[in-house]
Amino acid sequence: MNSFLLNRQLGSVSPQALAQAQNQHLLQALQAPYNVHFSQVGLGEHEVIDAAYQPPVAHAAGVNSIAIDRFEGRYLLSGGADSSVAIWDLERSESNTDGAVLHLPLGHAAKTSTTGRLGITRVSFYPFDSLAFLTSGYDRTLKLFDSETLSASATFDLESTVHAHATSTVATHLLVACASQHPAVRLVDLRTGSSTHSLAGHSGSVLSVAWHPKNEHTLASGATDGTCRSWDVRRSASSLGVLDMDDSIGIVGYDGKGLGSRRRERGQAHNGAVNGLTWSEDGQFLVTTGTDKRMRVFDMSTGAHLLANFGPALENSHNTTLTPLMPPSMYSHTRTIYYPNAGEILCFEMQSGSLQKRLRVPQSVPRANHIHQKLNRTTSLAWRAHHIEMYSSHADGTIRCWRPRTAEDAEAEEEGFAADETAQTASAERKRKRDELNQIVQGLTKRREM
């Protein structure tokens, strides 16, 4: 970095190159701070958190999904496996003398399901206003909530378990795409309240859906039949095409919108269920994950499989949504993918598939009265807008923050600790001298009295 600063002063590199190099440096330095926690219960001033033994939990039954508002990057929404939801202010926290930073919920609803404590599968903020949010769950419903009162303002019964939902951030419509046990993708119109429109084509339960980041009418879906389909929601016909993991060439003349020379009707994206979809920021690539423990990248202009090999480290065996995360492209000169693995988060370079870093999730030791140790499985990832920060949710009920900690930060902390230790030593020495002086004065006073 010092060489970049020198070259910037000499004018040999642009300010943009310097900023991107610094952002890349910070991106590679992400790690979980030991003293940042999310908890439903506050701490006393002198209470100590033993995170290595049992960290505070945000949801006692586990956290299934999190989301961060894309406008301010300030509010985090979490949904629990017991149908509870909570909203957290990332800029407001409590601290104690031990140095622990504790986030407490701004609002918390212990139960959102009317048919028992059936877990939430997905939470998301309303795409154009963070004062409302959506939830889907095992109670077969999609719900629209008020962020201030945490009360449901609308409920849509889809008559089958809703594995995930997605909203478009660029659309003029208010369609919510829902992935459910039904083989058709259900579209719910928040403007009219209808949920009759569906996209038929899959032969198994739909597990994941994702809207194109640039085209408001293009949608991708993945299902248990191993297929990944793209759709134009304005068309009543079949899907635009199917992605094929065995095709590394693609369809010449195909524009990804159902037009061109031809479209593919058969093919599989994975040998197992497709349970995760993520578009690149420009919409050129689609990243898919499957229960065959593979992650694949497709060029959506041709449908070609890029053949990026992400190695054997991926864990994915549950028929639940497991979505990788791609940070904003301005932070890196290469496309980066974060994969929520068991007990860790893996960082990959997208086009080559090379593993860049493992972000280890701090392990906790279960208490003696815990009969079963909860899995420390990563269930969801969310990027904080306007910051180089990532947040992860876990099946053990914790929410973790990932921030850059560079070598310069470590040196500054060591210098701070050394300064504190020196100050404590000097203070102890001054106290010793005061005590000795007081003893001398007391001795002289006693002699005079005698």
Positions of PLM-derived features:
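Beta-strand-rich domains and repeat architectures in extracellular enzymes and scaffolds
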Residues: 55-83, 339
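Blade-loop segments of beta-propeller domains
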Residues: 57, 94-125
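Conserved strand-to-loop turn within each blade of WD40 beta-propeller repeats
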Residues: 79-82, 136-139, 178-182, 222-225, ...
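Per-blade loop-tip surfaces of WD-repeat and WD-like beta-propellers in eukaryotic adaptors/scaffolds
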Residues: 46-49, 87-109, 139-175, 181-206, ...
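Terminal intrinsically disordered, low-complexity extensions flanking WD-repeat/beta-propeller proteins
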Residues: 2-41, 250-256, 309-450
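A short helix->beta-strand "capping" segment at the edge of beta-propeller domains
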Residues: 28-62, 102-112, 260-263
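Loop/turn segments within WD40 beta-propeller blades
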Residues: 67-73, 124-130, 166-173, 203, ...
